[in-house]
């Protein structure tokens, strides 16, 4: 069942490398948002962010293409894709470390007027506190773009005060 809703995930993409089973899964808050929007029936779903040029990046790209998530405004740069090391202890996921977003942590997405024009085509743009998109949020607000934002469960009061004025829907996962 399709709904006349369009959703864009803007920001992070990573692979979670589950060391105990030697398996790599695509993820990241913005990627997961785009995939689940599509799976839940959004008529249009897209992801916009920066990929590295390694096997991890290609895995995420292929997975998004398999899910029919639009990638038209993504960038691919030379460098490692975001990756985290994960295991499971007593049934709970435990993060062992990460490369801090890989190339995406070093080369931040800077929105221009063409990006904003594209983003205005969506009912909601979703980002989060691990997306490295904070400095672009005022541009989204000024353009009248509806923003949802996941603060996760480890943001500070100062961070909330800095980001909340640019957010229409806040989540704390």
Task: Label the predicted regions.
Residues 1-22:
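Positively charged, low-complexity intrinsically disordered leader regions
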Residues 4-5, 121-122, 167:
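Local beta-strand N-terminus motif with an aromatic residue
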Residues 6, 43-46, 70, 145-146, ...:
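Residues at the starts of beta-strands that form the adenosine-phosphate
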Residues 15-20, 42-123:
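Conserved N-terminal subdomain of the carbohydrate kinase-like
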Residues 21-29:
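A short, glycine/small-residue-rich beta-strand->loop->alpha-helix junction that serves as a flexible
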Residues 28-31, 100-102, 151-156:
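Short, acidic/turn-prone active-site loops that include or flank metal/cofactor-
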Residues 30-39:
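Histidine-anchored nucleotide/phosphate-binding helix
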Residues 124-173:
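Conserved beta-alpha-beta core of the PfkB/ribokinase-like small-molecule kinase fold
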